[in-house]
Amino acid sequence: MIKKFIDKLLGKGAAGAGKHRFGKREEVPASVHGINPDLVDRRASDVVRTLKQAGYEAYIVGGAVRDLLLGLKPKDFDVATNATPEQVKGLFRRAFIIGKRFRIVHVVHGRGREHEVIEVSTFRAYLDNTAIEQQVSGNEKTSKQQLSGMQHAVDASGRVLRDNVWGPQDEDATRRDFTVNAMYYDPETQVVVDYHKGIQDAKKKLLRMIGDPATRYREDPVRIIRAVRFSAKLAALGFTIEPKTAGPLIASQALLSDVPQSRMFDEMLKLLQTGHALATIAQLKKLGMSKGIYPLLDVVVERAELPFVHAALADTDRRVGEGKPVAPSFLLACVLWQDVKTGWDLRLAQRQHPFPALQDAIDEVFNQRIGDVSGRGKLAADMREIWVMQPR
């Protein structure tokens, strides 16, 4: 039902909506793009060099290239290659294949708190979901057994459930979300490979979706959240979201109801814990999306102007900016303390003993607001510890 409703709203089937557009390869030299090679992490360059010496293609990719073009030093460096995960793993002493939905390799440099992880992904094919034979019912949570042995699978709504079909670089670029995140940089030749005018958009400071935005949101509804997150993150640098990219966001929002709760919870934390929580809330309001993405996020947005909550959000942004760790338990405990306090006061008015009354109020709020998410046990314990300290 949701798929049909969204299709009607977005006009699925319009001419050209399903065409493959792999873009035209442009190799842009250093004299044009102006990237300062001193901003490139040596460990990322070493990973690229090792892969190339083994006969593979390899590039720094994604947001790191965007930041380099803007003259910024990236916090994280990802590498893309035509080597398979198994081939990548065989080239490095400390490399680990992770993920099932998207199989990637973590190449680890250093140890302890000083260690650095370079994420290496294999070029992936761009597959038109209308041509996929491996269509399954259910969603990411209910179709794990059905996905066994599949390299690429989608559900009836067109959402990608598994994406491990390797392909050429041009298709890998097309399957990425935004033009400014779909460029490839070779630190040895200092050439940027650009298929979708990403350099041009970076100079214009424009966040633009690759392909038809409505179709891309249908393929993976979490792209809706990423559009908000990146537009908020890049707003501080003067970026604006392209109207065609922003246009279908509200109409596509209902697609998020099919995404498993644990994944939605994780995506919400990314919105709030990547150093741009206040900017994200402002962007949600600007886009008319302050409600309806995720119930707990609705509460955060609603209470963001309360001094206690605003201070917690601002402190989280500050700590991320300073490279310090942040904990979801602290931020969520601040946001939901109002509910716990109300429930506790109600129980005290009924002459319940203070400590058991507080514990009951905590249980009620956690079950209602957080629900069944991955990592629930530790999160609950940490939030409980914070809340129990408040009456002291």
Where are these regions (language model features)?
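Catalytic cores of the polymerase beta-like nucleotidyltransferase superfamily
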Residues: M1-R392
